[in-house]
UniProtKB/Swiss-Prot annotation:
Residues 19-394 form the FMN hydroxy acid dehydrogenase domain. FMN binds at P98, I99, G100, S129, Q151, T179, K267, D321, S322, G323, I324, R325, R345. A 2-oxocarboxylate binds at Y45, Y153, R188, R294. It catalyses: (S)-lactate + O2 = acetate + CO2 + H2O. The keyword Ion transport does not apply. It comes from the Bacteria. Homotetramer. This is L-lactate 2-monooxygenase. Its cofactor is FMN. Binds 1 FMN per subunit. It comes from Mycolicibacterium smegmatis (Mycobacterium smegmatis).
Length: 394
């Protein structure tokens, strides 16, 4: 049996034959190097948060308020980090969270395909965004046998929503993640300062311009055939923007649940009452997240919301993201009750540094650190990693 921590031995072994790492090993260095590699507009979009970015910073700081209590003499030579979710075996309790501009983070402009390829090689599941350069069908092919999930920005037009859902089903996605907190754009000073919003420029809209329902409605609206969508991305962007502004309701979730057998996961849940109602409505998963502090400033760190959301969700799996920067953060979120933990900015920086290989390196580095922490601290599997393993440091 191999452990994720073996990546450490691989790196040291290469050093013995004179091969030094070409990619940095820590979040701070990933970010610093990526800042030199990315265009200003992409960098501001990925790095920025809402308002004065207090919530974004608080997401990260929250992890420092908890420490893992070590247990000795536990025979943790081998660790099992696999997890069963929605009928699929995940090789690790970590996933690539959806990022709308991940395509633009890679030097070749195809970071979404690169993410799926890294997913296939590592076994770390990928949640692909509706906003992508590659089509959702192509991205699913790149992910291979690794579980993959489609994230939906729910449009106000149900015909279009159903079209996306049917396409995801036919492409072989293993579940549907509905984002709840991005029906309107948060106040993001970094982007506003340079008047930059990539999607209004027609970027990352491939899933829309290739969709038959979108094409039909666009033609009825403008008289332009589908070919015109590809030739004039600004026209497509204007029409796309008009589809936003619909705040997702419980009735919408009931409707989605009625038309698909795919597992349905709700992203953006932070209040325990919302988690309870979601479970009662029949959804298959809860995704505790505050969008990395990108949508609403002045809120709680997502980690502070996690324990109550987990408790309210009962046996329903709970995914988590927001503020993950290290393998230690991954371990702490799992101990707080997350079924699996999503990374966002770390793999965006990886895409900037080395495309698919950079993303793979980031994932393997985080999982190696998490695995080695569990080894040193005496936790052999995820069942042993509970909230009782944590102590407050403040």
């Amino acid at each position: 049996m191999s452990n994720w921590g073996d990546y450490e031995n691989e790196i040291y072994g290469q050093g013995l034959v004179g091969v030094a790492p070409t990619l940095p090993m820590s979040y701070a260095d990933w970010e610093a190097h990526a800042q030199q590699a990315l265009p200003p507009g992409v960098l501001s979009y990925v790095a920025g948060g809402s308002g004065d970015e207090h919530t974004q910073r608080a997401n990260v700081e929250a992890f420092k308020h908890w420490g893992l209590m070590p247990r000795m003499l536990m025979a943790a030579t081998e660790r099992d980090l696999s997890v069963e979710l929605w009928g699929k075996t995940w090789a690790a309790p970590m996933f690539f969270a959806p990022i709308g501009v991940i395509a633009l983070c890679a030097q070749d402009g195809h970071g979404d395909a690169a993410s799926a390829q890294a997913s296939a090689r590592t076994g770390v599941p990928y949640i692909t965004s509706t906003l992508a350069v590659s089509s959702l069908e192509d991205i699913r092919k790149h992910a291979g046998d690794t579980p993959a999930y489609f994230q939906l920005y729910y449009p106000e037009d149900r015909d279009l929503a159903e079209s996306f859902i049917r396409r995801a089903e036919e492409a072989g996605y293993d579940g549907l993640v509905i984002t709840l907190d991005t029906w309107i754009f948060g106040w993001r000073p970094r982007d506003l300062t340079i008047s930059n919003f990539p999607f209004l420029r027609g970027l990352c809209l491939t899933n829309y311009v290739t969709d038959p329902v979108f094409q039909k409605k666009f033609k009825a609206h403008s008289g332009v055939e589908a070919e015109g969508l590809r030739d004039n991305p600004r026209l497509a962007a204007d029409f796309w923007h008009g589809l936003f502004g619909h705040s997702v309701t419980w009735e919408d979730i009931d409707w989605v649940r009625s038309i698909t057998k795919m597992p349905v996961i709700l992203k953006g849940i932070q209040h325990p009452d919302d988690a309870r109602r979601a479970v009662d409505s029949g959804v298959d998963g809860i995704y505790c997240s505050n969008h990395g502090g990108r949508q609403a400033n002045g809120g709680l760190p997502a980690l502070d919301c996690l324990p109550e959301v987990v408790k309210a969700s009962g046996d329903t799996p709970v995914l988590f993201d927001s503020g993950i920067r290290t393998g230690a953060d991954v371990v702490k979120a799992l101990a707080m009750g997350a079924s699996a933990v999503g990374i966002g900015r770390p793999y965006a920086w990886g895409a900037a540094l080395g495309g698919s290989k950079g993303i793979e390196h980031v994932a393997r580095s985080l999982l190696a650190e998490a695995d080695l922490i569990m080894a040193v601290d005496g936790y052999r599997n995820l069942k042993e990693l509970t909230i009782d393993a944590l102590r407050p440091t403040r």
